[in-house]
Swiss-Prot record:
Signal sequence range: 1-27
Cysteine disulfide links: C225-C374, C317-C347, C467-C494
Annotated spans, Disordered: 631-662
GO MF annotation terms: endopeptidase activity; identical protein binding; serine-type endopeptidase activity
Superkingdom to which the source organism belongs: Eukaryota
Cofactor(s) the protein needs: Ca(2+)
Primary gene name: Pcsk1
Domain P/Homo B: 460-597
Keyword Acyltransferase: no
Designated name of the protein: Neuroendocrine convertase 1
Gene3D superfamilies registered for this protein in UniProt: 6.10.250.3320, Galactose-binding domain-like, Peptidase S8, pro-domain, Peptidase S8/S53 domain
Pfam family, one: Proho_convert
Location in the cell: Cytoplasmic vesicle, Secretory vesicle
Propeptide boundaries: 28-110
Amino acid sequence: MKQRGWTLQCTAFTLFCVWCALNSVKAKRQFVNEWAAEIHGGPEAASAIAEELGYDLLGQIGSLENHYLFKHKNHPRRSRRSALHITKRLSDDDRVIWAEQQYEKERRKRSVPRDSALNLFNDPMWNQQWYLQDTRMTASLPKLDLHVIPVWQKGITGKGVVITVLDDGLEWNHTDIYANYDPEASYDFNDNDHDPFPRYDPTNENKHGTRCAGEIAMQANNHKCGVGVAYNSKVGGIRMLDGIVTDAIEASSIGFNPGHVDIYSASWGPNDDGKTVEGPGRLAQKAFEYGVKQGRQGKGSIFVWASGNGGRQGDNCDCDGYTDSIYTISISSASQQGLSPWYAEKCSSTLATSYSSGDYTDQRITSADLHNDCTETHTGTSASAPLAAGIFALALEANPNLTWRDMQHLVVWTSEYDPLANNPGWKKNGAGLMVNSRFGFGLLNAKALVDLADPRTWRNVPEKKECIIKDNNFEPRALKANGEVIVEIPTRACEGQENAINSLEHVQFEATIEYSRRGDLHVTLTSAAGTSTVLLAERERDTSPNGFKNWDFMSVHTWGENPVGTWTLKVTDMSGRMQNEGRIVNWKLILHGTSSQPEHMKQPRVYTSYNTVQNDRRGVEKMVNVVEEKPTQNSLNGNLLVPKNSSSSSVEDRRDEQVQGAPSKAMLRLLQSAFSKNTPSKQSSKIPSAKLSVPYEGLYEALEKLNKPSQLEDSEDSLYSDYVDVFYNTKPYKHRDDRLLQALMDILNEKN
């Protein structure tokens, strides 16, 4: 009897478990606002039922006759519970044979599961492509990749998109490129033939174009080199740099086969010597204009440009008319440490950033190389632009109807500032967008860009408008050393006219400035919304007396703002060279934008924690603006803010002021630990490091020296804050604590 009772209990328990499991499965279902029904009588009967019962008739289900799909007019899009009452009412209709509410079904692709990104491809250098995959050993480290793999996992790999590389040629028979080579996207303007093959020489001087093309379209899973960002795209090469370059050659290259080529990638420009001011000639400018108007069947060619490698020479890409063009997407670089590399230039025209080389300890970029070889040492902004071009190819596969301006909006709206947040110079513009003269709107995020470009939800941006503001009564204004010229520019942004602008894109300030030493000029423009932008920073090597003649200084920093109000132009010379003199001859402000706000901008930009910065992979809390007080001239010159003979009370006062500015405790700990573990060898090893101390004023002076000038927001009294490079030690660095330690030791040495 007991045995029978036990059996009944077990059976009951089993049935209960099965019932719970079934209900659990059912509970996990997500029911959608769609009903399938079998109805005889054709579409007329289905339409009548829909109208009577409050449905929208979505149509016949596939090729199944008498089967229709309905959507209820007053039901949520998704629900965890089925709407039994709605289903019953539909089923009770005599004309309905069968009805069922639809629910989401989980389906998985029956492909072999991958253990990790390391196993995605058999290409031998794939594991070295740190910028395309998450190579972290622990989740506590920040992600470094461009978020490309999630796009590939959707099957988006660049199919149907054509990119051409304007450079010194393309080794098109390279076994990692040949399968994706497109002869219709290729030409040799140096020798005027259809073969862009590079000229070999003993130094492999003409490897540049092949390396850039490899980044974009190296074939996947062919046991050769690495993997291109858009590894199923088609790539061509324009050979135009290996010989005499003329305006005609540039125009022919920029405008080559615009009905076939989608994206043009260029990693070149005028000399990055810190003293050149040059842009496209008349013909090249017309080629750009033709490309955006007629290219890609009227949707506009996509021009991707490297922002320049003149950082060591103090160059400024605002003096490069190619990156400064409204028609190009100017791409800067970030190192593996998430920092602005030594070669990078600053300017207000840079739109976004991708990864490239940094210090000698950082990994570089992998690609194909001459003589059917491979390389892991591709460097500079030359390597950043092709990565961006590859990402844009992924977006064009996802949505071929994107216009050239759509692409720029997508870049602005999805680039991430957080991975680069430990760099100085970030500011929020009047539209709530984070922007930086070193990085534009931040690091490219391929997944976010492609997701936003989804043709099911993306709406092409409104028609572009142009509004020109100028003062016909303006009289030339004189400028001398240690002087300034301020021009107030009130505008209604062509309000009430067909070309009225309510949402900004690019802003151009076209000016003629005569000056005895061009490199001493500093130009800022403050928008009606209060965003201050450095249009031109000093260039020590630029001693030219030629000034600027009708030069377009371009900025993207006010993107999304309403331009109505008063803008302020300020031109200064703080060099102290008393012999300097000149004048502002004429100017005009050119606003580019739209009369109505683009659809995707009607809600504020939301920044995510993707690729969160953690102080160069050290797990230290993120730096914030240490202080917000205005800089003194000493701070702008990189000098210590407290002289050697300062009293302790003055040091204490300054420390109290900085505590109110919320200095980072993590930085203090980092300085202390760095000093402790790197003390001179004469210190006894028996003394515990915890007993070592750094003078409190030394800690704060190090913080000031490293952060104060460069962390300040732009204001009338901090024109130079975005361009002070004290933060980036000129000596090779490995991690942030090395630079902090170096600054601290410099301070202590000065005191001893």
